[in-house]
Amino acid sequence: MVHLGPKPPQHRKGSFLDVPEYLLKELTELEGLLTVSGETLRKITDHFISELEKGLSKQGGNIPMIPGWVMDFPTGKEMGDYLAIDLGGTNLRVVLVKLGGNRDFDTTQSKFALPENMRTAKSEELWEFIAECLQKFVEEEFRNGVLSNLPLGFTFSYPASQGSINEGYLQRWTKGFDIEGVEGHDVVPMLQAAIEKRKVPIEVVALINDTTGTLVASMYTDPEAKMGLFSGTGCNGAYYDVVDNIPKLEGKVPDDIKSSSPMAINCEYGAFDNEHIILPRTKYDIQIDEESPRPGQQAFEKMISGYYLGEVLRLILLDLTSKQLIFKDQDLSKLQVPFILDTSIPARIEEDPFENLSDVQELFQEILGIQTTSPERKIIRRLAELIGERSARLSICGIAAICKKRGYKTAHCAADGSVYNKYPGFKERAAKGLRDIFQWESEEDPIVIVPAEDGLGAGAAIIAALTEKRLKDGLPLV
């Protein structure tokens, strides 16, 4: 059996002595399918680099590589009061960020629940609601008033095209929103008009993507940070490139911007390998793709993001039942329901601390109505390990590709998201994957994944501060 990454303590895993030979044979085949060798990781990384380059070209590619129009590095010395908002699927988050100027900041925040009808409301109602929430927040936090307009950074996690940091044309609503009169329009002046109508002393100076916010917030507090990452229900990465390396910017930036100027890039690399050239897809991955709302899209995301981990496990278990190898004479109706096993299920399976895997037993009884045997639970545990390990190892190919592309020999890669933060063993498996790609000889890894700062709040505020400084210095925003 091939074991990659950290091994669970032996007393938790138990032995496979009671597992029938026919099941062990099947498990060995599945280990071969789901195990990603160091050599394969290196090949994927090389292909990843070429797709990153293609995304920056005039012709474009699978990976969008969207310029974020943040053209300065945070120094950590930025100071002042800044506001940030994040429009999520169910809440509006308003954050006051006080930048301390010594790579430090304090935040105060409030959440406002979106009214039930807001997702399908009229455009004016959405902006009026946000302006009203901002007014309440400012009146509460600045009871003596403010001397000048508060700069605001707007985290807008919906597909938008930008030609500068202070504009964003909504391409299409996602996350269940369907508000008329917004798609195809610049959201910044719409929000600004609603704010001015209420005479709230706020100026919207920056519209940002959440992963770009994670990058900038982490660079503010950590001078070694080179990348912002997200690993949760989706996956993404952001980093700084230079204008000269981005052919598709030709003719879109003023002549007085130096070719060596930095430019934040929001990769959206969940779309890596949409052409299915390099990723080691199994028949289970192919089935997930074919039955998804957008077949052929987000190939990388479908193999590594938390949204799909439980579904891979479900499909493998269904396959084993079709061969009459497990769950004999059981009611499988619930197991046949797509996505009935969310990301928490393989995570909880891996976390079961008991040698007899009694937590797994209860889990399958509770969620699927299936009684499991001891050998079946051991197979289920091993499958969860393999799926989690594959996700972690594949996910770092994006990190490795960006580091190689930019020539980073050392880097802190700041990661956020539920899979990174909560999935058992993910950090250790990802670190092992990076070692397998770079084959370092040093005792300490020069490129490491670290917890990210709050990109939705602090990141948006710091970008607002950088934008405000550019305006004061008379520098162009495009």
UniProtKB/Swiss-Prot annotation:
<keyword id="KW-0808">Transferase</keyword>
<comment type="function">
    <text>Catalyzes the phosphorylation of hexose, such as D-glucose and D-fructose, to hexose 6-phosphate (D-glucose 6-phosphate and D-fructose 6-phosphate, respectively). Mediates the initial step of glycolysis by catalyzing phosphorylation of D-glucose to D-glucose 6-phosphate.</text>
</comment>
<feature type="domain" description="Hexokinase">
    <location>
        <begin position="21"/>
        <end position="465"/>
    </location>
</feature>
<dbReference type="InterPro" id="IPR001312">
    <property type="entry name" value="Hexokinase"/>
</dbReference>
<feature type="region of interest" description="Glucose-binding">
    <location>
        <begin position="151"/>
        <end position="177"/>
    </location>
</feature>
<feature type="region of interest" description="Hexokinase small subdomain">
    <location>
        <begin position="75"/>
        <end position="208"/>
    </location>
</feature>
<dbReference type="Pfam" id="PF00349">
    <property type="entry name" value="Hexokinase_1"/>
</dbReference>
<comment type="pathway">
    <text>Carbohydrate degradation; glycolysis; D-glyceraldehyde 3-phosphate and glycerone phosphate from D-glucose: step 1/4.</text>
</comment>
<dbReference type="InterPro" id="IPR022672">
    <property type="entry name" value="Hexokinase_N"/>
</dbReference>
<keyword id="KW-0067">ATP-binding</keyword>
<dbReference type="GO" id="GO:0019158">
    <property type="term" value="F:mannokinase activity"/>
</dbReference>
<dbReference type="GO" id="GO:0001678">
    <property type="term" value="P:intracellular glucose homeostasis"/>
</dbReference>
<keyword id="KW-0324">Glycolysis</keyword>
<comment type="similarity">
    <text>Belongs to the hexokinase family.</text>
</comment>
<keyword id="KW-0021">Allosteric enzyme</keyword>
<dbReference type="GO" id="GO:0006013">
    <property type="term" value="P:mannose metabolic process"/>
</dbReference>
<keyword id="KW-0418">Kinase</keyword>
<dbReference type="Pfam" id="PF03727">
    <property type="entry name" value="Hexokinase_2"/>
</dbReference>
<feature type="region of interest" description="Hexokinase large subdomain">
    <location>
        <begin position="209"/>
        <end position="454"/>
    </location>
</feature>
<keyword id="KW-0547">Nucleotide-binding</keyword>
<dbReference type="GO" id="GO:0005829">
    <property type="term" value="C:cytosol"/>
</dbReference>
<dbReference type="InterPro" id="IPR043129">
    <property type="entry name" value="ATPase_NBD"/>
</dbReference>
<dbReference type="GO" id="GO:0008865">
    <property type="term" value="F:fructokinase activity"/>
</dbReference>
<dbReference type="GO" id="GO:0004340">
    <property type="term" value="F:glucokinase activity"/>
</dbReference>
<dbReference type="GO" id="GO:0006006">
    <property type="term" value="P:glucose metabolic process"/>
</dbReference>
<feature type="binding site">
    <location>
        <position position="111"/>
    </location>
    <ligand>
        <name>ATP</name>
    </ligand>
</feature>
<comment type="pathway">
    <text>Carbohydrate metabolism; hexose metabolism.</text>
</comment>
<dbReference type="GO" id="GO:0006096">
    <property type="term" value="P:glycolytic process"/>
</dbReference>
<dbReference type="InterPro" id="IPR022673">
    <property type="entry name" value="Hexokinase_C"/>
</dbReference>
<comment type="subunit">
    <text>Monomer.</text>
</comment>
<protein>
    <recommendedName>
        <fullName>Hexokinase</fullName>
        <ecNumber>2.7.1.1</ecNumber>
    </recommendedName>
</protein>
<dbReference type="GO" id="GO:0005536">
    <property type="term" value="F:D-glucose binding"/>
</dbReference>
<dbReference type="GO" id="GO:0005739">
    <property type="term" value="C:mitochondrion"/>
</dbReference>
<dbReference type="InterPro" id="IPR019807">
    <property type="entry name" value="Hexokinase_BS"/>
</dbReference>
<dbReference type="GO" id="GO:0005524">
    <property type="term" value="F:ATP binding"/>
</dbReference>
